[in-house]
Swiss-Prot record:
Keywords, sorted A to Z: Glycosidase, Hydrolase
Active site: E160, E375
Class of the enzyme per the UniProt entry, highest EC level: hydrolase
GO cellular component, one term: cytosol
Catalysed reaction, written as an equation: a 6-phospho-beta-D-galactoside + H2O = D-galactose 6-phosphate + an alcohol
Protein name per its UniProtKB record: 6-phospho-beta-galactosidase
Pathway: Carbohydrate metabolism; lactose degradation; D-galactose 6-phosphate and beta-D-glucose from lactose 6-phosphate: step 1/1
Keyword presence, Signal: no
Coiled coil region boundaries: none
PANTHER family, A to Z: GLYCOSYL HYDROLASE (PTHR10353), LP05116P (PTHR10353:SF36)
Example of a GO MF term: 6-phospho-beta-galactosidase activity
Gene3D superfamilies per the UniProt record, alphabetical: Glycosidases
Length: 468
């Protein structure tokens, strides 16, 4: 049976400042930790990325032509405050005013994120969000943006608090490149959630127009053997690390007893302790019912198996299928069922996981108001032929995920939009330029844009709301 989506559904495309803009030192932009980290550790940099800094009129014109009526954009904090605090950079402010004006001219609603992995270097090298002083600097930056950019109707505090902490302190593929420190993972997640809560409260108390929420990456976790209690426990613990800890903070304003039991077990096995203060929970509690929306980024699910050995994580950054490894002491290891498809980067393709995650939020956090799927898409080694890409695999991936969103809406979930990652090809943090996601192919040598087959398919779905 052909499935449909509501008439007012947003069909969006997603971007991020550092992954798309380029111009990393242009017009007074301050450095971010990624600048040097990429130079020192990877075979690519974020220059020029997709040159969105200069070519946003082209991308927004394409968006309008192809039925994309929403765009996720992030403000580069260091374009506004080059050192994260202090003096404002007027050229950065002017750039974003111009960008938002172009969005509205093209009838593409901007959903604007304040922090998308790019803390200014001056604050990052001073502990990033492990340093509580940086909570204050973030809230001050947020307040400046709320006042300055009154043309923005949809604000997001953070993009993917979970993967920030994981990338920085667990997997170690984000600066500062620390591995296997679970206490730092939880502490950074907690401090960012406090930052989020304070910004949301400030937004509501200030009477600013528009809506505000947060974007969480929520990969669904399943036991490898649902009949094995140890596998069930492994999935629960993995879910706490990646999903439940931050969801509790968002919508409960505290961590449930079950969540804290899991956190305490993980820290008992792996070492470290947390600094959770009474005033933190006052802030979390004050914001728990103020979130206008939740953004869910969903790409994959994982199956977890009980495991007694030492922690070892190998990140597949080059698309060499089967090269990844993930096992955490006292938690479990990832082991996929043989019949579940994977991408070249070992990301498991499982649309049902998105449905299950949406319905889990609806069931466990009934004070949620609405959901946007703020990222979903397929990373591919696109083959550029005849000035396009025949990306049937991507079309199939997006179609199946849109279908389960339709199912979730039919089953009572309030899902209001979908943003494909990514609008155009961008640079990928730990995979470079080979891993492409865009509706529009970017020739990174010439910066020309070419609509892929998926763009024409997406246009038809956006215009008809019929998924076929």
């Amino acid at each position: 049976m052909t499935k449909t989506l509501p008439k007012d559904f947003i069909f969006g495309g997603a971007t991020a400042a550092y992954q798309a803009e380029g111009a990393t030192h242009t017009d007074g932009k301050g450095p971010v930790a990624w600048d040097k980290y990429l130079e020192d550790n990877y075979w690519y940099t974020a220059e020029p990325a997709s040159d969105f800094y200069n070519r946003y009129p082209v991308d927004l014109k394409l968006s309008e032509e192809f039925g994309v009526n929403g765009i996720r954009i992030s403000i580069a904090w260091s374009r506004i405050f080059p050192t994260g605090k202090g003096d404002v950079n007027p050229k950065g402010v002017e750039y974003y005013h111009n960008l938002f004006a172009e969005c509205h001219k093209r009838h593409v609603e901007p959903f604007v994120t304040l922090h998308h992995f790019d803390t200014p270097e001056a604050l990052h090298s001073d502990g990033d969000f492990l340093n509580r002083e940086n909570i204050e600097h973030f809230v001050n930056y947020a307040e400046f943006c709320f006042k300055e950019f009154s043309e923005v109707n949809y604000w997001t505090t953070f993009n993917e608090i979970g993967p920030i902490g994981d990338g920085q302190y667990l997997v170690g593929k984000f600066p500062p490149g620390i591995q296997y420190d679970l206490a730092k993972v939880f502490q950074s997640h907690h401090n960012m959630m406090v930052s989020h809560a304070r910004a949301v409260k400030l937004f509501k108390d200030g009477g600013y127009s528009g809506e505000i929420g947060v974007v969480h990456a929520l990969p669904t976790k399943y036991p490898f053997d649902a009949n094995n209690p140890d596998d069930v426990r492994a999935a629960e613990l993995e879910d706490i690390i990646h999903n439940k800890f931050i969801l509790d903070a968002t919508y409960l304003g505290k961590y449930s007893d079950k969540t804290m039991e899991g956190v305490n077990h993980i820290l008992e096995v792996n070492g470290g302790e947390l600094d959770l203060r009474e005033e933190d929970f006052v802030a979390l509690d004050a914001a728990k019912d103020l979130n206008d929306f939740l953004g869910i980024n969903y790409y994959m699910s994982d199956w977890m198996q009980a495991f007694d050995g030492e922690t070892e994580i190998i990140h597949n950054g080059k698309g060499e299928k089967g090269s990844s490894k993930y096992q955490i002491k006292g938690v479990g290891r990832r082991k996929a069922p043989v019949d579940v498809p994977k991408t070249d980067w070992d990301w498991i393709i499982f649309p049902q996981g998105l449905y299950d995650q949406i319905m889990r939020v609806k069931a466990d956090y009934p004070n949620y108001k609405k959901i946007y799927i703020t990222e979903n898409g397929l990373g591919y080694k696109d083959e550029f032929v005849d000035n396009t890409v025949y990306d049937d695999g991507r079309i199939d991936y997006v179609k199946k995920h849109l279908e389960v969103i339709s199912d979730a809406i039919s089953d009572g979930a309030n899902v209001k939009g979908y943003f494909m990652w990514s609008l155009m090809d961008v640079f990928s943090w730990s995979n470079g330029y080979e891993k492409r996601y865009g509706l529009f192919y970017v020739d990174f040598e010439t910066q020309e844009r070419y609509p892929k087959k998926s763009a024409y398919w997406y246009k038809k779905v956006a215009e008809t709301q019929v998924i076929e």
